[in-house]
């Protein structure tokens, strides 16, 4: 009954590239990882009907041409989970509502009512899903047929590798998106990046060197920086010509220092994403200049006259307090029972309101910093040559620390090296994932233009 639909043949962009046969090792790693994830989902009650070595929900299995069991029990569970999420969202809206209730205690009562409804429907839905998974057999549901699904996995991986021209991280993102019924471009998302990190990392660590050769592992090509054709600056366009010259000068200093070389087109792609080549760009949290350097990072690198008033650190302290209050508000919400409901609900709303107050104060301080920084021309981050020189040196160091892995160096630049270590790969933050995707998109655009010159 295996019949792949046209979705498997659609490219993400451009014509599909050739790819090597899918290695058995990669398939084995995904199978092991998916089976472990399924077991975890049953234990922590995040299971939503995903079955087999592909972890397909029945709707997706059917789309991919498999015979699946769905039935009323599963459909009822899905409906209950949807209603439970709506009830939870109602509770959260009341927690965040700044308006005064018309009657004392009204907000707490509404929170209790919505959350207990959420809890009741979630418990009922999870019980139905346990019944559902116990009822499945390989004879009635091809998601449980290892041979059929292993063949399908190879086909999906092969298609993903062709669509991404052998870029392994992106191919893994496309693969898991297809298995989850997600249509996403770029392929790597905050939702799937943990899967990508785990499978990519294990495959690269376990595979013999020859098995890795056909794949693009996001590695820096050390020869590119020193072997660019004379007209390479034309690839970035006339609007960035001056910035390209500054990058070229900064690369010369790196070469004299013995630092790891950086493809100037990669770094220009980073600048384009960070500041759109605007030398006076300032982010909402105070990163400044072409390369969007934070005050503390600038000082650590030895930049002088960095505008770094005391209240700037106060803004970050407020940010931490805001997040802490929000976490505590959610914890209070999820501790609600029929017995303690009103007390916990009132506390949850109080904490959420405090989080929102801290957020407003934080935004006020950051706005003040942006205004004042624009009046500080001596800040070297706003001087194009200094921003490029120090930003390039910093990025070069990150590339060295990440052993030439461009994706991890970009993630480190955006979220900090400690976050890359924490998640053993690209952190699952929306901003960081989008940053990595966009820089590499610009980089590939420049390389394509270079090939056409």
Could you tell me what each predicted segment is?
Residues 20-453:
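Catalytic glycan-binding domains that act on GlcNAc-containing polysaccharides
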Residues 2-11:
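Bacterial N-terminal signal peptides
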Residues 11, 17-21:
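Boundary at the C-terminal end of the N-terminal hydrophobic targeting segment
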């Amino acid at each position: 009954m295996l019949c792949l639909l046209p979705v498997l043949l659609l490219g993400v962009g451009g014509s599909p590239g050739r790819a090597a046969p899918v290695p058995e090792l990669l398939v084995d790693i995904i199978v092991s990882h998916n089976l472990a994830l399924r077991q975890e989902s049953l234990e922590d009650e995040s299971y939503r009907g995903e079955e087999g070595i592909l972890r397909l929900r029945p709707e997706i299995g059917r789309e991919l041409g498999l015979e699946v069991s769905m039935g009323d029990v599963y459909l009822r569970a899905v409906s209950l989970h949807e209603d439970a999420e709506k009830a939870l969202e109602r509770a959260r809206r009341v927690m965040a509502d700044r308006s005064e209730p018309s009657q004392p205690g009204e907000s707490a009562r509404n929170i209790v009512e919505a959350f207990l409804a959420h809890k009741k429907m979630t418990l009922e839905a999870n019980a139905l899903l346990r019944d559902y998974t116990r009822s499945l057999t390989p004879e009635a549901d091809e998601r449980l047929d290892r041979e059929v699904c292993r063949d399908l996995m190879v086909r999906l991986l092969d298609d993903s590798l062709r669509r991404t021209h052998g870029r392994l991280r992106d191919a893994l993102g496309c693969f898991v998106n297809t298995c989850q019924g997600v249509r996403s471009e770029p392929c790597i998302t905050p939702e799937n990046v943990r899967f990508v990190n785990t499978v990519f990392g294990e495959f690269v660590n376990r595979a013999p060197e020859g098995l890795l050769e056909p794949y693009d592992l996001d590695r820096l090509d050390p020869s590119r920086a020193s072997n660019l054709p004379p007209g390479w600056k034309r690839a970035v366009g006339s609007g960035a010509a001056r910035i390209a010259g500054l990058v070229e000068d900064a690369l010369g200093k790196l070469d004299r220092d013995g630092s790891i070389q950086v493809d100037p087109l990669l770094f220009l792609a980073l600048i384009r994403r960070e500041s759109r080549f605007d030398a006076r760009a300032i982010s909402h949290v105070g990163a400044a200049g072409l390369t969007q350097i934070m005050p503390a990072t600038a000082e650590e690198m030895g930049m002088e006259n960095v505008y770094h008033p005391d209240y700037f650190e106060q803004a970050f302290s407020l940010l931490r307090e805001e997040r802490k209050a929000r976490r505590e508000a959610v914890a209070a919400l999820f501790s609600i029972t029929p017995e303690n409901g009103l007390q916990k609900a009132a506390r949850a709303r109080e904490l959420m309101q405090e989080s929102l107050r801290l957020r407003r104060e934080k935004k006020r301080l950051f706005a003040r910093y942006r205004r004042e920084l624009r009046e500080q021309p001596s800040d070297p981050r706003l001087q194009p040559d200094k921003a490029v020189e120090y930003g390039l040196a910093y990025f070069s160091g990150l590339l060295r620390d990440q052993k030439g892995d461009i994706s991890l160096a970009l993630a480190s630049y955006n979220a900090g090296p400690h976050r890359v270590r924490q998640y053993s790969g690209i952190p699952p933050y929306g901003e960081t994932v989008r940053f990595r995707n966009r820089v590499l998109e610009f980089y590939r655009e420049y390389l394509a233009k270079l090939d056409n010159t």
